């Protein structure tokens, strides 16, 4: 509670300090001090819960005011609620005391009950109708106190009775915000279900989400995020919820917020309720300042999501840079921007106690700069505004270019330039046709490329940047104007890395590649008139989820002088362009800070600007960076124009080429067109050089092509042989490129790039007659790399060229021959590409080199055309490397060294005058798990190279046939993709139709809503009009009532005047009745005394009746409880009786069965007795038989002796017969004896069994008798209880009869009093002696009438009570009948 008061009551004085001499009593939950001296009797009684004392105070002669207040304006109801005496609260509410009284702190009794967690008291007050929306001194309502005490039931009851949920206290805390501070999850969830405002904020504009983050409750944060709260809202200091999470160190909540932000719609707007200014001149500021580290959150998303975010902004060019570099490319001006970032302090600052939750947040300022450069390049038919910026910048599409940027395959922006007679050149027609094919191929192959990060320590990051920037050397220019022009076109690589952080830098893979690219600087030379004005344009596209780099460069050759010293100066000042890019694996590559910074410095440091001299060509360089649907396109175009001094703009041939890459490949194609014209009006050479370096997704392939300079052609045969020796060698090139992969550490990789790009130099140009053009178009179809190389050597006399174009408008024979050679070469290169390339190519790194240009002498056109067929052989090769899924982490030091050493071998051959100046093309690829560096060194003029080239030509012819088959397969795939595209178009059209239907429905619904709103507004207006009419009618009604009252008073006054007149007239008549008046006066006094006595009796009777009623109520409650108990016992007894009856029945059955058994046993006994008698009868017979047997034995012995003595044989035989007879007789006699013994044993056993059964039956019968006795006792008890209840009923009836008698007496008294009043009225009407007597009599009459009404009402109340008693009697009789029925049932069951 202290926190609530401290938060809400700023500046409010607390309670006064207690007096040390007074007795102090503290309540349980009230934080004030109580003084008994300040309290009244009613307050002490209420605080102690003494209800009877309060009753005596209110009923006595001097009733106490229930709303009396103490010294601090607290009533008895306040004290009862604080101490939780619900009986006192009910008593006070029944006595109709004030429920919404405010104490000294503006709190109602309901607030005090909720503050002290007295639920019973609060429920009583709410049911009685206490106001729930009163506000105390601190702005808290009853709902605030319920939320603070974390009592969910009270919160629910308050809201169900209509408490306002959005009230703010003086600290601007709603109940929801207070619940969040208390970390009570259940109350927060309940308030949110009751539609509490989840976007509420306190006085410092901290939202509910921010408070939940500071409290560290992830569950409450999850609840708020489900309510779609404003995640991007800011407090007074501009800090968002995300930054609160970062500053408080709550990582899991921070991750939860980031996941929610990613799930938000793709084009979020600033949802800050207060609103932020978006009208700054820097259009990227809303995106950058909306959330902390917005650039990082943008770059962490996929390219598709980043593109959608950027597309939602204004149509101006808006650019977002990387958060680590802090650079945003926009208009040419540079505006610094401050972004506050939260930084974690030490662990000691963040360790705080859980109760206080005080957190310290510090913010450090970081500056980011915004810088862009725009260059306008003007072509004959079109002006294009191209944006140029650093390699790690992202440019947003303008209104003009947004449609182009959103497509997967960009269409070439070069418009065809027609000749004088409206015919297009052969080269242009061929280029546009090939571009269409490549557009289709890239549509087929387009796939989504995942964006990975490279985590680099900051030290490494800065070192690389420094080493790059240190090698950028600016040479002196002849004029300041030229210097300014070149500075406009130069890349600002130094400003890229100003805001690198000291901690690790997480760089997306695509951004890391861009940072490693070299900033190119282009010279601008003064224009001179020339015979030709070609414009070369190159467009490179990367499909969905890939970088699309379009780079067109046209390099102009300065006018050369014949002196060798001049040639050396030009060689030293030649323009060196290099574009090494570094791809990073899907896994993070961790590099030290030092090595990382060195890489950047060494790369950008090699950019050198050559001095601007008088020349014939004027290059215009422009770069355009756009964000398509899911891709980043970089378009770089450079157009170089040269005119002859004599003939201005006769011919304008245009060469446009397009190179496309599949979905997961980055292709860099760089074309350089070198145009040179001699100061004379003779035909000038315009050589063109195109080179390509491609890297697959998981392999870096380096394909290097080098073209070697041909010696100056003379009519002699020796010079022709030299030129043949300088041709390219196919066989050696294939042998070197088809070797195994070379896995190099990362450091070696970096060094090789540095040395390669560092040693590329430009040879000086001299006067010549021929115009060789070399163009290359390379496409990567479905996981294959196609290499198309076209080289056309053109040598024309200026006069002949002008004549052919001006007169006939047709291309020359040399052009036709060159196109034929180009077709042958394309077939060979396609064949080689389909054989070798199997790996998946995802990213390309282009390294641009410029081959030296040789000075050529004038020669006839015919001779040059003949020699072109023999000498324009080229060598192309593609190395396929199987893709692997992981990159190797390579050290930076070895990486840079190896690249420097390999590039060191690439040197320019000495320049010689020649009629041909072929262009070179180089393609380098590096595999995924290693660095495959295959470099083709310059071939010197040898006879051995010619033989190898001639041997390689048949293999090219064989490759053509294979390439045709591959082309057919590709065309079939193209048709399938076209069909798929048609199906998708149909689905899109259907989706658009559905969208249009939904929009129509939405419009209809909006119209309906508007109509409903109008009707609601009309109804509200009608209600307001009715209320206004009621307010107008109210005073009229009051006036009418007042007039009626006045009329009634006037009538009464008239009547009184008439009576006075009658009384005055009767004064004379009543003068003789003075004695009777005195009697009447005495009688009045007696009546007054009697009335007072009656009042006392009525009061005593009321009190007695109340006491009796309370006693009766208590007795009735007790009887009801007893009846309930009896009913329960009866039910239990019924159950037991039924159980016992069933048991008894079973026992009876058993007994009957036993009786039958016993009867059978008795019969057996009788049989046994008969057998015993028979046995006894057999005993004498046995004795006699034994005697006979003994006698026979003795006789036998005697006879034997006699026979022995006599020895007569016949006598022995006779004796044997006699013995056998006697033996037989004995056996016959023994058999009945055995039978008799057996029969005698069986009845004895049966008798034993029968005795046991009888004993068991006796025990069972004893138990049954005991149970019967118990049931009889219970029946007696029930009868006794019934008799007691009957006695109580009789008592109640007697009491009711006595009450009726008393009521009858009271009624009789009332009648007598009425008679007396009537009699007194009659007397008063008769006498009417004086006015002084009349008015008191009227008052007495009224008083008596009121008393009579009260007595009558009391009688009615008693009658109602009697009716209630009668109803209760009937209920009791019914219960008694039930008892009787159950008792009878028990008796019957006991008897049965």
UniProtKB/Swiss-Prot annotation:
Keyword entries, A-Z: ANK repeat, Coiled coil, Repeat
Domain of life, per lineage: Eukaryota
Source species: Homo sapiens
Amino acid composition bias (Polar residues), ranges on this chain: 267-280, 576-586, 830-840
Protein name (Swiss-Prot/TrEMBL): Ankyrin repeat domain-containing protein 30B
Coiled coil: 960-1168, 1270-1318
Composition skew (Basic and acidic residues), residue ranges: 636-650, 864-874, 904-915
Lineage, top ranks: Eukaryota, Metazoa, Chordata, Craniata, Vertebrata
ANK repeats by residue range: 72-101, 105-134, 138-167, 171-200, 204-233
Gene symbol of the encoding locus: ANKRD30B
PROSITE patterns xrefs: ANK_REP_REGION (PS50297), ANK_REPEAT (PS50088)
Location of the region described as Disordered in the Swiss-Prot/TrEMBL record: 1-21, 265-292, 558-587, 636-656, 671-690, 830-877, 904-926
Tissue: Expressed in brain, breast and testis.
Coiled coil among keywords: yes
